[in-house]
Amino acid sequence: MGSELETAMETLINVFHAHSGKEGDKYKLSKKELKELLQTELSGFLDAQKDADAVDKVMKELDENGDGEVDFQEYVVLVAALTVACNNFFWENS
């Protein structure tokens, strides 16, 4: 068994690939796949967003190369940004 960090990294990879490739490129998330990932894995994030267009905005911000899909590198940017934003909350409540 790996360290906590190795396990966390493996989980991030597995979550991405569990949602990618259901339609189109198996190494990227379509808008529909990104929405499904956010709804199942980050439902608290979506619940906190009062904006009905939250997924569209997230997709636009993440899709750095403008191909209409989110690749693994772009997905990691989302996870890292959310982790930074949540750091104080989790640290203070642990």
Curated annotation (Swiss-Prot):
Binding site for Ca(2+) 2: 63, 65, 67, 69, 74
Residues covered by the EF-hand domain: 13-48, 50-85
Positions where S-nitrosocysteine occurs in the chain: 86
GO biological process: positive regulation of sprouting angiogenesis; regulation of heart contraction
Positions of post-translational Blocked amino end (Gly) modification: 2
Chief site of localization: cytoplasm
Subcellular location(s) per record: Cytoplasm; Sarcoplasmic reticulum; Mitochondrion
Positions annotated to bind Ca(2+) 1: 28, 33
GO cellular component, one term: nucleoplasm
GO MF assignments: ATPase binding; calcium ion binding; calcium-dependent protein binding; protein homodimerization activity; S100 protein binding
Organs and tissues of expression: Although predominant among the water-soluble brain proteins, S100 is also found in a variety of other tissues.
InterPro entries xrefs: EF-hand-dom_pair (IPR011992), EF_Hand_1_Ca_BS (IPR018247), EF_hand_dom (IPR002048), S100-A1 (IPR028486), S100/CaBP7/8-like_CS (IPR001751), S100_Ca-bd_sub (IPR013787)
Keywords: Calcium, Cytoplasm, Metal-binding, Mitochondrion, Repeat, S-nitrosylation, Sarcoplasmic reticulum
Post-translational note: Glutathionylated; glutathionylation increases affinity to calcium about 10-fold.
Task of the protein: Small calcium binding protein that plays important roles in several biological processes such as Ca(2+) homeostasis, chondrocyte biology and cardiomyocyte regulation. In response to an increase in intracellular Ca(2+) levels, binds calcium which triggers conformational changes. These changes allow interactions with specific target proteins and modulate their activity.
Miscellaneous comment in the UniProt entry for this protein: Able to bind zinc in vitro; the binding sites are different from the calcium binding sites. The physiological relevance of zinc binding is unclear. Physiological concentrations of potassium antagonize the binding of both divalent cations, especially affecting the high-affinity calcium-binding sites.
Quaternary structure and partners: Dimer of either two alpha chains, or two beta chains, or one alpha and one beta chain. Also forms heterodimers with S100P. Interacts with AGER. Interacts with CAPZA1. Interacts with FKBP4. Interacts with RYR1 and RYR2. Interacts with CACYBP in a calcium-dependent manner. Interacts with PPP5C (via TPR repeats); the interaction is calcium-dependent and modulates PPP5C activity. Interacts with ATP2A2 and PLN in a Ca(2+)-dependent manner. Interacts with mitochondrial F1-ATPase subunits ATP5F1A and ATP5F1B; these interactions increase F1-ATPase activity.
PANTHER family in UniProt: PROTEIN S100-A1-RELATED, S100 CALCIUM-BINDING PROTEIN
Protein name, per record: Protein S100-A1
Chain's gene name: S100A1
